[in-house]
Amino acid sequence: MVVTVRAPATSANLGSGFDVFGVALSKPADVVRVERADTTTITVTGAGAQYVPTDPQENTAGVVAAALDAPATIHINKGVRPSSGLGSSAASAAAATVALAELYDRPLDDDALVRAAAQGEAAASGVAHADNVAPAILGGFTIVREDGIEHVDASLALAVCLPETTVSTRDARGVVPESAAMEAVVSTVESAATLTLGMCENDPQRVGRGVEDALVTPARARLMDGYEAASAAARDAGATGVTISGSGPGVVAVCRRRDRKRVAAALVDGFDSAGVAASAYQTRIGDGATRLAADGDDRAP
């Protein structure tokens, strides 16, 4: 028996929801194919495959297989570029979790699936955190709590930009303030509440206002040449809000569907004005991990 699952790219933090908020993107995605075996082996193809470890102890899908006691021959077709800030390792972990649970007939509930996938994330980041794997499994908008996951089946237009630069996760974590003035805390709580309401109502204006934060994004923006120019250009083109995706360097802009193409182009132009090459694409908040038909195409979209 072979099980094939597609799991999407994700954007975590969303400005005001540091380590808490996440959304699934309709594209790109990883596609993971699993088959029972005595020991786990991993092969990887697709975007940035050369940067993805195939040692099961170092690969997120391999760690998931060990956590579930579900050895398998695992093939990962990467659609989510590693080190993009779009949850590349989480996409593989999420797809592997859903696929292996199906392969071994393990009826796990959503929280258990997310917990298992988060263990895989520890192979990539050193921390079993769920802000990317939760939306990769459940889709829509998710809120990660210590005792569970809140989920909203949101659907909003987005533009995503990938500048040709790198941001170390260690550096991105290192610049996050350890303390903050009460005024900044109140402002961030206000934004987080506004964003959550906006997701519940599929309101791009509220979500756009809600991604603004006074704590994490300003600190991380200093690590990204061209971010301020790209953010300003996107807003001029109709974006209701712009923020760094995860620890970067990916950038996500909230917008109305009619403005999405123009916003994507503006993000590229903004980075270009600062001497940074970039590419961008149009997407939306989308579905989570999905099993593909047995004879389906396992190419990563």
Curated annotation (Swiss-Prot):
Keyword match Ubl conjugation: no
Pathway(s) where this gene product acts: Amino-acid biosynthesis; L-threonine biosynthesis; L-threonine from L-aspartate: step 4/5
Family: Belongs to the GHMP kinase family. Homoserine kinase subfamily.
Chief place of localization: cytoplasm
Enzyme class, broadest EC rank: transferase
Catalytic reaction list: L-homoserine + ATP = O-phospho-L-homoserine + ADP + H(+)
Transmembrane region(s): none
Organism encoding this protein: Halobacterium salinarum (strain ATCC 700922 / JCM 11081 / NRC-1)
Phylogenetic classification of the source organism: Archaea, Methanobacteriati, Methanobacteriota, Stenosarchaea group, Halobacteria
GO cellular component: cytoplasm
GO biological process, one term: threonine biosynthetic process
Role description: Catalyzes the ATP-dependent phosphorylation of L-homoserine to L-homoserine phosphate.
InterPro entries on file: GHMP_kinase_C_dom (IPR013750), GHMP_kinase_C_sf (IPR036554), GHMP_kinase_N_dom (IPR006204), Homoserine_kinase (IPR000870), Ribosomal_Su5_D2-typ_SF (IPR020568), Ribsml_uS5_D2-typ_fold_subgr (IPR014721)
Keywords from the named record: Amino-acid biosynthesis, ATP-binding, Cytoplasm, Kinase, Nucleotide-binding, Threonine biosynthesis, Transferase
Listed name of the protein: Homoserine kinase
This enzyme's EC code(s): 2.7.1.39
Cell compartments where the protein resides: Cytoplasm
Binding site for ATP: R81, P82, S83, S84, G85, L86, G87, S88, S89, A90, A91
Molecular function as annotated in GO: ATP binding; homoserine kinase activity
